[in-house]
Structures are given as C-alpha cells and as structure tokens.
Amino acid sequence: SDINSLKQMDVILTCQGGDYTSEVFPKLKAEGWDGYWIDAASTLRMADDAIIVLDPVNLNVIKDGLVNGTKTFVGGNCTVSLMLMGLGSLFQNNLVEWATSMTYKAASGAGAQNMRELITGMGYLYNNTKALLDDPKSAILDIDRQIAELQRGEGFPKANFGVPLAGSLIPYIDKQLESGQSKEEWKGQVETNKILGNQQIVPIDGHCVRIGAMRCHSQAITLKLKKDVALDEIEDMIRQSSQWAKVVPNTREASMTDLTPVAVTGTLTVPVGRLRKLNMGKEYLGAFT
C-alpha cells in the first residue's frame, strides 16, 4: 500500500480484498493517478465509472468502455457470473422477460477459514457419534437426536459462519437490506444488468442460501421468456454462451453424475441441466447450473 510506488504503475491488478481497495484506491485517485485498476473485490462494482468484467459475455461492453476512457474494471459476483456464463446468450438474444435464481452457495464463497470450519464441523459430528455409528444395532433416531444436540451445543465450531453449517444450511448471506433482500440477493439484478449493459432492466430476484458444499456454487433458475422457444434451440444457445458452458441432458443419471459440485470442482466447466418447460406455460423455462 505504498502510494508513491503504486502511482508509478500504469496498471494495478489487485486480489487483496475490499478493505485494501477501500483504503488504497481513493488515495491513489487523490494523488492524481490515472492508470488502469483491475480488481477482484466487490467494492467498486457498482461505481458509475467501473465496468464489471465477464469477457466471454460482455466483451463488447469492455471494448466500448476502453474506447470511452473507462479505467476501472472489476470482477463480478460469483453466482451472477456463473449464471451468465451458462445462460448469457438467452439474455443477449433479448429472450428473458424476468428470472429468479435460488442459489446453493458453497462454503468457498465465504473464504478459506469458513471452508476449514465446514470440515471441522463434519469431523466434530462424526467423532462424537462414532461409537453409535459403529454399532450396527444402534437406532438411527438416537444418532439423529445426538447430532441435533451437538449442532445446538456450545462446542460446535461456528466462529466463522456464526451458526452450524455442517448437516444444516444458512438461508441468509451478506447484509440485510431495507427491501427485505440480503445484499447477495440484491446483486442478482443490479450486476446482471450492468454486466450486459442493459438500458431496459431485466427484473431478477431470488434467495441465496449457504449449503454444506466445499466448492462450486449451484443455482436453480426460472426464466420467463418473451416467447415460446423450442428446447433444442435453447440448448444450442446455451452451448454458444461460452466455451465452458455444457448442456447436461435432463435425465436422472446425467443430472446425478454431471450436475453436482463433486463432478465440477477443479474444472472450468459450467454445466447447465434440468432444462425443461414448466407447468406455468411454454414461456417458462427451468434450469439448474
């Protein structure tokens, strides 16, 4: 954070987190620095003079920004970016009237210490019920009762999440807003529309939930399309969304083997499956990614 050294740079690429950005960026600007700031933190995402970078989807917006003098480029929210990596072409082809996203967010989104805490919680439950688990005559209701007592007890590791995650879930992520949304849910609409450079806002809302997966966020998406589009056409558009998008056939076997965090972690694949028209009408599309 040596401002004198940093202001000599033409380009600064930072992955130091929001506190660093909040401290350093204003000081650099106050010193008259006019270089390119490329940032993984969320701090500057919604600034008027910043572009949210998702180049497989919004390269045209990025190029226009460069031509017009934009110098602040920021990475987007995880599930917003993943939704657009998989379904971006439906938005780009102006087919989406509105969307809901119900997210199943992994521990990794909360940070390294939270990932450790999830594993520690799993171990705590196992170690304290091992005697019953090893006894084939033990009743599962007794084990279940003991698990619940352990989760509610003072000894359960929850310093980072605040409540137990292992064997449970957390139906609220980030700050509480006056709208009733969490901040994580608010990001869905504002960031999607900013990434795409939309002049007319596409309404997006949903619920963001933390689950006991280590990595790979998942989301169940409902899209209200502006017209009836055949599923095979939709699948072709998804394949064109990015080179990493993969259509998973809507079968039980394919969904269970190819559409899970276990299948995807460690890869760059963005699988999109459970694609089907919903009972509400032919313009309603369900997806899981």
List PLM regions with ranges:
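N-terminal Rossmann-like NAD(P) cofactor-binding subdomain of oxidoreductases
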Residues: 1-160, 201-203, 227, 236, ...
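Contiguous C-terminal substrate-recognition/catalytic subdomains in enzyme active sites
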Residues: 130-262
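Coil-to-beta-strand transition motifs
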Residues: 216, 282-283
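Short, well-ordered beta-strand elements
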Residues: 285-289
